[in-house]
Amino acid sequence: MSNQAPFAAASGTFLIGGDLPVYRMGLGTMRLVGDYAWGECDDPAEAKRVLWRAVELGITLFDTADAYGPEIAEQMIGETLAPYAPGVVIATKGGITRPGPGQTEYVGRAGYLKQCVALSLRRLKLERIDLYQLHRIDARTPLEESLGALKELQDQGKIRHIGLSEVTPAEIEQARKIVNITTVQNRYSLADRRHEETLNYCQQHGIGFLPWYPIAAGKLLKPDQPGAPTLAQIAARHGATVAQLSLAWLLQRSPVILPIPGTSKVAHLEENVAASTLHLTPQEWAEVEAVVSL
């Protein structure tokens, strides 16, 4: 891999909803706020530099949520990047309240979601949100009510595309009877593949899959764990880190995967984007799969 940070274009392009192009390597913004998604981060100035550098590196997909901060990540994006560069796509989420650090409650009432969208538009300095994702399904509220509210806002031109987060194939099927679902955001990584069935469903139906926590290789990043030396050796062949290897694996795993690794440091951002140029050979892919199955 080159020492010069490449552009995100090397990761390839995906059309959200068939008409909204993004480079597949995106940026998640939860790390731009404090621990447990609460309050400001330790270095807000560096966090803003991350956003600027992301644009310079060609990243077009920025994923955020009103629950990050709460509100802080959206506000930082609006203050730092608006007016937005051509091609920049802002994806945000609503449907979670955060009473305190590490605390979450799911709220899917129609009136609440409409308010969430209105406030997100204001903070992000947008007239229309490119991709609005229901952050979690609220078991106390009929899905028809939650998604019906988002469909109404879509018809009004306030939302372009609608997505879901942390869902099963059955829930996606139910949702698609109400509104067109263009993306799904579930936890997924090289070492955490519990949502394999959901990813396969998304690939079958051309739905974008945004894996959150995509570098969470867990034990695979620890040198003293089984399989870790093998991953380190494969990464070293490419002049890369195991974290970069895990991102490259995601890009090769499925053409619908849109990794959104987060960071609060410019140097780490550049490392993540550089993973777009790493390509595993069939033999290396088999080696990685053998390690993951340990």
Model-derived features with residue positions:
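Active-site groove signature of glycoside hydrolases
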Residues: 121-139
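Short, acidic/polar
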Residues: 40-54, 108-124, 168-174
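Beta/alpha (TIM)-barrel catalytic core signal, keyed to glycine-rich beta->alpha loops juxtaposed to Asp/Glu
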Residues: 3-13, 137-294
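Conserved beta-strand positions
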Residues: 27, 64, 92, 131-134, ...
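N-terminal binding-site loop/beta-alpha segment at the start of enzyme catalytic domains
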Residues: 1-88
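N-terminal small/glycine-rich loop or linker at the start of catalytic domains
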Residues: 18-38, 91-104, 128, 133, ...
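Alpha-helix N-cap and loop-to-helix initiation/capping positions
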Residues: 39-46, 72, 76, 104-115, ...
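Acidic (Asp/Glu)-rich catalytic clusters
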Residues: 17, 78-89, 121-125, 176-178, ...
